């Protein structure tokens, strides 16, 4: 009987080193492998510049963050947006909080809605982007916010971020590290669920997406497959040195 994997990846530091495949690749397979490695290197460069620095966020904001992110996850689900949209919106919001101080949870929630709307326009097809009126339905009661004010908040956020919206989220790395169909589809789906569950936890916010993606994939493999399957799956990931921003 096959034993389940018992890899402990409860924290970022526990994520083990991935192993390169030793199988000989030729033709199209080798080209795809080289392309994936180039893509990962480029994404890792971008993530090094767009991962938020937790030390720059005020303690009062960190205290409010878990509840605000949980609310954002709920809004994202109700709007039926893509996984990439949620992950990008959380990154935009965290980066904004690193550079801009504001007062109270109400403003925090409004800016979270603005981040989700910005991310949706960057990720979603045009016909899937929610209208401003739809997004304003989620603005906290007690705060007056019409479309004109919301547009100003959006521009404020973009200016603070220097209009740099692109960011390789954990979902981008999950898809690169674990391509294919069949069981790997289940692994990606479970890894995404694990990643989403990690979002409200402040300790994960400054972890680079590539490291978080490996953590989530390991947990997914550990839950779904035997120890042999875990080694085979994790062995297809590129070599990298776990690090935090």
Curated annotation (Swiss-Prot):
GO biological processes: cell division
Role: Essential for the control of the cell cycle at the G1/S (start) transition. Interacts with the CDC2 protein kinase to form MPF.
Family: Belongs to the cyclin family.
Record has Flavoprotein as a keyword: no
Keywords: Cell cycle, Cell division, Cyclin
Name of the coding gene: CYC1
Protein name: Putative G1/S-specific cyclin
Organism for this UniProt entry: Colletotrichum gloeosporioides
Keyword Hydrolase belongs to the record: no
């Amino acid at each position: 009987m096959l034993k389940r994997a018992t890899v402990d990846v409860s924290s970022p530091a526990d994520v083990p080193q991935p192993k390169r495949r030793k199988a000989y690749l030729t033709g199209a397979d080798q080209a795809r492998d080289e392309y994936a490695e180039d893509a990962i290197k480029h994404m890792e460069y971008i993530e090094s510049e767009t991962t938020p620095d937790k030390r720059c966020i005020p303690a009062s904001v960190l205290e409010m963050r878990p509840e605000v992110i949980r609310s954002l996850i709920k809004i994202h689900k109700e709007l039926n947006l893509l996984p990439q949209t949620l992950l990008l919106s959380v990154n935009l919001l965290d980066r904004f909080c690193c550079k801009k101080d504001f007062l109270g949870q109400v403003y925090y929630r409004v800016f979270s809605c603005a981040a989700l709307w910005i991310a949706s326009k960057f990720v979603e097809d045009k016909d899937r982007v929610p209208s401003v009126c739809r997004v304003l339905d989620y603005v906290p009661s007690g705060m007056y916010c019409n479309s004109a004010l919301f547009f100003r908040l959006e521009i404020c956020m973009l200016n603070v971020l220097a209009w740099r919206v692109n960011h390789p989220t954990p979902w981008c790395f999950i898809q690169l590290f674990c391509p294919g169909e069949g069981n790997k589809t289940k692994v990606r789906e479970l890894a995404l669920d694990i990643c989403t569950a990690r979002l409200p936890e402040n300790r994960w916010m400054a972890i680079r997406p590539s490291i978080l993606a490996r953590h989530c994939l390991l947990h997914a493999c550990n839950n779904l497959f035997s120890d042999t399957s875990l080694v085979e799956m994790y062995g297809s990931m590129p070599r990298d040195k776990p690090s935090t921003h």
